[in-house]
């Protein structure tokens, strides 16, 4: 009789253990499912991000957005001497300034920097021969530029900066960017720009962060502008996405590791549950044997 009671206690204990393992299994399955869902979402996000980066990179590589002449010259760099590339590809700026700088440069974005006047002459002959259109060339040996000299302008309300100081470039291009942007002020908004223009008697050009322009002499140009249409906006987006991509890929690897760990925990819980069920069956069989069934 004592053996039967012991067997019944063993069967009951095994049933209790199974209940605990079943709860643990449910918890670990929820955790594993959540980890899998997080990994799938991150995989999709990373895929979309990588596709966007690939598209923008291809557009940069193919000089998408540049005119025919610029494309022809840049794609023939191996056959032409002294070609550095279009202004837009020789500089970087923060995303918050990209629209203003793009407007400030205008067609100058597509000007092609070359070593010498002779290199510009050869490139012009190349375009003429191929009926490839026209381009403007900026020889490093010829271009000279100056920065704004008006005193106190940097202290004006709404002054963001002289445009040439809001872009990053190799120091050898300093004269190029001074000539293109050295006498342009970037202002917070049109009200600030108008106040500055009045005070300094329209002595320099002002471009606002949202792309409105007050020209030297007082004429104004403005309206709506697409923030994603230009080559600088594209370059700024590409730089931002590349920075984000490394972080996203790191998170994806962490999500994969978390999913794998949760699956291992789930497998361990399944093994424990299976073992407990085997022990319960053995205990129940022993009870039946002792009962003489």
Residue map of PLM features:
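Extended alpha-helical coiled-coil stalk/rod domains used as structural arms in giant protein assemblies
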Residues: 1-55, 59-66, 196, 202-293
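Phosphate/adenylate-binding "loop-and-lid" substructures adjacent to NTP/NAD/dNTP-binding pockets
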Residues: 68-77, 84-85
């Amino acid at each position: 009789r004592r053996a039967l009671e012991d067997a019944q206690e063993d069967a009951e204990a095994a049933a209790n253990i199974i209940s605990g393992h079943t709860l643990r299994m449910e918890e670990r399955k929820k955790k594993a499912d959540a980890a899998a869902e997080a990994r799938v979402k991150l995989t999709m996000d990373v895929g979309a991000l990588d596709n966007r980066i690939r598209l923008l990179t291809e557009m940069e590589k193919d000089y998408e957005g540049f005119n025919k002449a610029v494309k022809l010259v840049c794609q023939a760099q191996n056959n032409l001497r002294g070609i550095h590339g279009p202004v837009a590809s020789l500089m970087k700026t923060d995303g918050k300034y990209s629209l203003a700088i793009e407007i400030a440069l205008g067609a100058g974005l597509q000007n092609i920097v070359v070593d010498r006047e002779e290199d510009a002459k050869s490139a012009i002959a190349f375009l003429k021969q191929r009926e490839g259109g026209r381009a403007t060339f900026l020889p490093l040996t010829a271009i000279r530029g100056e920065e704004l000299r008006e005193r106190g302008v940097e202290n004006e309300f709404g002054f963001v900066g002289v445009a040439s100081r809001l872009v990053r470039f190799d120091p050898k291009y300093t004269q190029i960017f001074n000539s293109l942007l050295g006498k342009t002020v970037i202002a917070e908004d049109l009200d600030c720009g108008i106040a500055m223009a009045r005070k300094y008697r329209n002595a320099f050009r002002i471009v606002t962060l949202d792309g409105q322009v007050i020209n030297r002499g007082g004429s104004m140009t403005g309206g709506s502008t697409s923030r994603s249409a230009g080559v600088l906006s594209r370059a700024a987006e590409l730089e931002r996405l590349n920075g984000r991509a490394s972080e996203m890929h790191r998170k994806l690897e962490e999500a994969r590791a978390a999913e794998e760990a949760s699956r291992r925990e789930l497998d361990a819980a399944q093994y424990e549950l299976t073992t407990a069920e085997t022990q319960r069956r053995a205990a129940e069989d022993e009870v039946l044997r002792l009962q003489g069934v």
